[in-house]
Each structure stands twice: as structure tokens, then as C-alpha cells.
Amino acid sequence: QWIVLYLIAKEFKLTDLKYAFDEILPKYLEYDLDLVEKIDSLNNVDFKELGNNLIINAKYFKLYEDLNQPETFNSLSEFVNWLKKNNYCFLPNGVVVDQNKGDAIISKVISDVMESRKKYKKIMLDYLEQGNIAMYNVYDTYQTAVKLINNAVYGVTANEKFRLFNIKISEGITTTGQLLIRSCTHVVNKYLNELANTKDKDFVITNDTDSIIFTLQNIVNHPTSTKDPEILKEISEYSRMCIDHVNTSIYSMCKNMFYKTNANKSNMFLSLKNEWLANSGIFIAKKCYAIHIVFKEGIPYEKLIPKGISLKKSSTPKALKPFLENVLNNILDFKSKEEIDKILIEECNKLKNVYKFKDIALPISVNDIESYKNLPIHIRGAKIWNSHFAQSDFDKINTGKVKYIYVKRWKDNLKLNMDGEYVISVPDQDKYWMYIEDKIEVDYDKMLDRLIIKPVSAFYSALNWELPNAVTSNNTGVFNIFMNTKPSLKIKLI
């Protein structure tokens, strides 16, 4: 951790090590209590003296044990000179890699997989340019599948059943990725501050494993409603400038933080590309956001992209699946709170007064009802169906698809009311709903909580909005709990 922190400070000429620790050092490495305790006092450092009092101990794998290598280095500069002399590469978790060897098998596999992904992406973009969205979506799925396979190659090194399992290599991959993306975030922010003639403004909204999302506010002044392809190209040019600057900086990072001294385009797998341009986005939490893109890889293209937000869960009734997407689209189209409230209120009214029981019941599967050791809500409801409503053994639930709904009161079953039972599951066939329609009073408060409140509450919180009184006044569940929480996140334009 000390080595990486010092190398970060030297590469970016940061005299404030607290900033380097908080903003750039991989979170994976922030567990050295001694470093955490001393970090506040390590300000205004002298780069020439940095690391001179650092003692570094080395432990060698069997292949290198008999090469008469030093076991201790008395300063950072001594360690760095040893890396350079032997053409070794340093990973942020402390692993040293011999660069004198030929291409490793894992990097060769990754290289081959990436080549196949490039072919799919080229075909995908050709279809997008032609306006053939159906075939574009097909090849987008293909290239995404190849990307997932590629990522799995990295992850499998941490699986002890994998033939080439090596936890140190796996940690090295994780920490290297974290350090690079956090370093690139720092470089992007610094560059955009120069373009905007500002100081210490945070242009980066969020970063992820392999991506950075940043805003161009105060750099470009076109309306967010802009759809002109030429203007979008002009805006994306700023993004390209940022990417070119970062990609140039990556070579310096690799040489000065990892000591990959022979880094060049032929042996570097990491390079950033401009994937999309969006006119709006809402950011709920880490890896949980939605954006409305208007330009994708150089081509005008509009689409809502949710990340970490499931708009159409399999457990959501079919009748309500368009609702959440409609809310998000209107939010990202900058509709007013009053307009969004109206959508919410209308859906609540439809749930109570328009939809039938079977339309709002939650779909789910049952796998051998007697095998459940605990009692999930749909199994609880299935047992009530079997014992009180099934008219024959053929009607009973054992396996298969069911739908469950919350019950406020059983109209002609005192025992179920006395026992406090509150749910009924019904086999997924329309005819069975006739058995219960006149025998239950639906708990619409709970159904509203489950189907409407939970999905939209995060959006309202991020926007610093309160839910409409027309909905909350008659509800005692999640609505009122939410109303008492303090929202912290806000919508951001990108």
C-alpha cells in the first residue's frame, strides 16, 4: 500500500497524500491501519525523499529462488531500480511479474476473444448506421456475450478449481483495474478543469469497473433537447479529446506506476473509447443508474439504458411492467414533478379500480411445495389455497407457476382472519380466480408498496422529491416510511 501510494504521488505530482489515498488508491488496498493512521500527517511531501525510509521485503516463487535475488530493499528507489534492471512489472497488490517471458496463456486467450468481439461490434455498428435496429440488437447481444466470456477469464483465476488458479494473480488483476480506472478519473477531471478554465470542479459523475461517466456542463452550452447529428458530433468531439488525452496518459501510468517499461499499442490491452453520449441521467447509487443516450459510437441513436435497475422483473405483473419505464422516460425527458406525480397517481388508481385481481397478482414459481424448510410468502399462500380453496386434488398447488396477492380480510373464513393470514397463491390459470374473487378483500396498501412505491421511491429520493399526498394519505406502509427519510442524491445531467 505504501509503495502504490508513493508511486501515485510521484506520477501525478501530488504533494497531498490524503487526496491520493482517498481518490486514487484502490479501495482494495485501504486496509493498512498504520497507513490510515499516518495519512493525515503526510502532507506537502518531498518527491526526492519520498520512499527513502521504506523497507521492502521480497518473497520469491520457486522458479526464482535460486537466482540470487535480493530479499530486502532499503528504499523505494532501490526497489524501482531493481525492477527496471530486470525488466520486471509491479502490480498494485505487490506481485512482481517477469516481462522477459513470452505472452502468457491467459493474455493470449483474452487477445483472441477480443478480436472476435471486434468483428461483432463492427457488424453491430454497420447495422446501426443503416438504421436496422433489429439486427443491431442481435449483434449487440453477441458482442456483449463475448465481453462476458472475456471478463470470466479474469475471474476464473480466483477459482481454486481452475487449473491455473492463482489468487495473487487474481488480486493483481483486480487492483490493477481499480488503480487504472481511478487514475483515469483523476486525469479526466484535471483535463476537463483545464478546458473549462475551472479549478477542482468534479466533472466525473461516477466510474465503474471499466467505464467513466462525466459531464460536459460549462464546456458545451447546447440545449439538452438537441438532436441535430452535427451538433452531437461536435459535442462528442470533446469526449474524444478527453479519451485521447487519457489514453496517452495510460502509457505514462504503466511505465511509472507498474514499470511496464515496454508499453506500446501492440502490448497494451487497455484503451478508453467513447461509447455513448447522453443528454440526461439519474444516479441512484453505486452501479445503479439510468441514462437516456442520444449518440452511440458516432451514430445518432436514442435509447433508455438502465444499469442496476430492473424495469421489467419477471416477478412484476405483466400489466404493470410498462409503468416504471414510463416514469423513468418522463424523468429523463425533464418532465415536471407534477407530471410525474400524475403518472404515479393514475397507476395507483388503476391498480385499485381498473385492474382485476389476476392482473396485479405477483407471478412466481413453486418447486415441490413440501420441500421448503422455511415458508416463503408464495408457499404460505399456496398452502392456504390447498387447504381452503382447492376444490379437488387436481386443483392443488405442488409445482408450477402461481400468482400471489396480499389479503386484508377473508370475507367468509373466520379462522384465516383469526390466524392473521395475509396472502393467497393461485395456480396460474384464469379459471381459478373465480374461486376467490368474492372471498377476499385485497390489501391494496401492501400491493401499492410492492408494485409502485418500492420501485419509484429511489427515483423520488434521488430527485429530492416527496411522494404526492394523494397517494400517501391513505397508505401506512413503505410510502410513509419513505416520507420520513432524508433524500440525498439528485438528478445529474450528462
Where are these regions (language model features)?
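DNA-dependent DNA polymerase catalytic subunits
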Residues: 1-109, 128-138, 142-146, 166, ...
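A residue-level signal for conserved active-site and pocket-lining positions in enzyme catalytic cores
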Residues: 117, 150, 478
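C-terminal reverse transcriptase regions that engage the nucleic-acid substrate
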Residues: 148-152, 156
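Inter-lobe coupling/hinge region of RecA-like P-loop helicase motors
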Residues: 159-172
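A generic structural motif
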Residues: 210-214
